[in-house]
Amino acid sequence: MIIILGAMDSEIDEFLSRLENRQEILWNGFTQHRGRLEGQEVLVSKSGVGKVMSAMVTQHLIDRWQPQAVIFTGLAGSLRPHIEIGDTLLACDLVQHDLESVALNLPRGQVPFSEHRFMPAHPVLLELAAGYQPACGRLHQGRICTGDQFITYREMNSHAYLTEELEGDGVEMEGASVALVCSVNRVPFLVARTISDRADEDAATNFEAFLPQASRNSLDLVRYLLREMALVDLGEN
């Protein structure tokens, strides 16, 4: 079983029409869709927006299905000029940018009393996904910063740490929480985002307009990855 997640229904819609032998499972207001895609048994679900919702759903699905891997897709904002709208960003690692424990003398993003700060994607999944050739835009690898904020131009002056301290390449609201849950549970994971905006004054408008294209791009990438995963052993995370 491979878990495929997106924050919102619109980020997973394209997957649902492609599922073979599709079955719906209801859990606490979430509709989860079990079936087969590219010959692999998968479960596609909305995670909900933000760190708490996405962590909750991810932990439930890991407990319920003991998946081989978790793949999270959807949209992100770019933090770098060379990563443009329409490009695809594969997360080499992820960090919670809004986790700050200065009183404990810990660096930003460090989970107190743990080893978790920058959470790396599974190397085999990352290597496989790096072979994907998007129909539009370019493919990048980099660091994704996650927080319970939708970053726009108004916030960027006070969020310079995203690039200066954390050296982030993209920003979104779920990836690092999913990565943390997967890391603790030793489940291989990959976060792949389509760039919808530049975290600027047009971010909200671009985000809404780009959802359909992002969902199609996510489907293409995941279908490619599923085909490649059938040929390898992920081993232990």
Model segments located where?
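Short, conserved "active-site rim" segments that organize catalytic pockets and cofactor/ligand binding
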Residues: 1-19, 41
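Glycine-rich phosphate- or other oxyanion-binding loops that anchor nucleotides, phosphorylated ligands
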Residues: 2, 26-237
